[in-house]
Amino acid sequence: RDRYIRTHYGNKMTEEQWKKYATETFTGFDTDETMCRLSCMNLMLHSVTNPQLNKQDSVSKDYMVKDTYDLILANPPFKGTLNKENISESLSAITSTTKTELLFVALFIRLLRVGGRCACIVPDGVLFGSSKAHKNLRKELVENQYLEGVISMPSGVFKPYACLLYTSDA
């Protein structure tokens, strides 16, 4: 990533833009503190001097959305379902479900700025599930967001997962 940006934008970015890139650009969330530390170390090895990685459950009601983002890249965990009383109300407004795969997609919709882009790995069920919650979330993506594409992964890569790409229009 760093090499790509330096190669393609190195002479186009001011010193102030480089400083912002290294100190303010990267934010992440995980419930596992070890994963936060490993991710932080990886980013620092790639010239990101101040990554904002936080240990928190971003779909729980304890998480309050404060910021919105231009770009979201995600491979969230999908552990089945959550207790309804533990789910963030802002996510319940987008999808009425306890399934984590749908809650994370709803979270990404909530976190994107207008015109923002998201690429996330999701189970095939998000695309083909027949429940009311699955259908409503797909309708949200098609009618209120800009769904650029769906990439089906080759067998064994993230089986049975696909990659969902969309841009926020809302």
Named regions from a protein language model:
Residues 98-158, 162:
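Conserved Class I SAM-dependent methyltransferase catalytic core
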Residues 65-66, 160-164:
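Short glycine/proline-enriched turns and hinge-like loops at secondary-structure junctions
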Residues 1-74, 79-81, 90, 98, ...:
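Conserved S-adenosyl-L-methionine
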Residues 94:
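Phosphate-binding chemistry for phosphorylated carbohydrates and sugar-nucleotides
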Residues 53, 83, 150-152:
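Residue-level detector of family-conserved "landmark" positions at structurally sensitive sites
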Residues 166-170:
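Conserved small/polar residues in nucleotide/adenosyl-binding loops
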Residues 84-87, 132-133:
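Short amphipathic alpha-helical segments
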